[in-house]
Amino acid sequence: RDFLFANRSNYPVAHRDFRWPDLEHFNYALDWFDAELARNHGSQLALKITGAGEAERTFAQLSEASNRVANGLRALGVKRGERILLMLGNVVPLWEVMLAAMKLGAVVIPATTLLTPTDLKDRFDRGRVRHLIATAADAPKFDGLDPTVTRIAVGDAPAGWHNYDDLLKGAPSFTPDGPTRATDP
């Protein structure tokens, strides 16, 4: 990055001499979001949601909330490499879960709220989904799908589902199980 900034007005040199870093380990949520953005710009606005569900979060708030969610997900059995189907609109939990999953080394399968039960069955089967996070209103779309999948609802959790708000009760600091290899999914 510094090389590109220093050569931003000299395109031939920037193009010829730039080399991507060859990292052995890298975790965006831990190594960039928390270590750089939250630490150095914690009070600055990181997220602004307008319209229904209007909300704002700073880098520090998202960092801590994602730590809590990561700890809560870990307590529910989410492990490195497992897949989480995430079906939420543009709401704060979407961003908290994205960062939390990265911290855990879990793989997020994003899903639009427009998917039908048939579409979701396909995602479950091909994606090898182990965990699911969706709104309580969308919970009926998952009826009849793999009952062993951990189900977490944003809103009033139906029977058999965990409540997302309980994840936010996790510890405010997070320690990863180990390093994330730069080649990990």
Regions found by a protein language model. Give the residues of each.
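Conserved ATP-dependent adenylate/AMP-binding module captured primarily in the ANL superfamily
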Residues: 82, 113-145
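N-lobe entry segment of adenylate-forming
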Residues: 1-57, 61-74, 148
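Short hydrophobic alpha-helices that are characteristic scaffold elements of the AMP-binding
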Residues: 99-104, 126
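Conserved AMP-binding/adenylate-forming core of the ANL superfamily
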Residues: 43-99, 116-121, 165-166
